[in-house]
Amino acid sequence: MIAVGIDPGKSGGLVKIHSRNNECSMHKCPGTTHEMASILRAAKNSSFVDSLPIMVAIEKVHAFPTDARSAAFKFGMNYGMWLGVIGALSIPFIEVAPQTWMKSYAPLPKIKQERKKEIKKIATEIFSEIYSN
C-alpha cells in the first residue's frame, strides 16, 4: 500500500509511505493546487506502477470561533483545495479527527504551542532517519 497522510494546516505537510520498500517522503504543505496535484499524482502513479492500493488520510479540521476570519477562511480554502485534488485524482481517502490520532501519543500538553512541539519531537524520534537527511 501507498499511504499518504496530510495535515492541511498552513504549517502542515504531507508524508507518503510506500509499504513494499519502506520508502518514506515528506513535503511541506504546498501553496498551490498544482503543487498538491503534482505530489499526489506521483503517489498515484507509484501505486499503479507497483500494483499497490493507495489511500489518503487527511486531518479533518475546522475553524474555531476565536480564529481570525481571514485565517479561518485561508485554512478552510487549503482544506478544500486538498479535498478537490484528492477527488479529481479519484484517490480513496478518509478524514481523521486530530483527537483520534493524538490518542496514540497521550498524554499531550493542553496548550496548543506546547502540544505541537511535543508532537514534532515524537515525529522527529520516529522518523529520525528522514529528518537527518
State where each predicted segment sits.
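Phosphate- and other anionic-substrate recognition elements at nucleic-acid/protein interfaces
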Residues: M1-N133
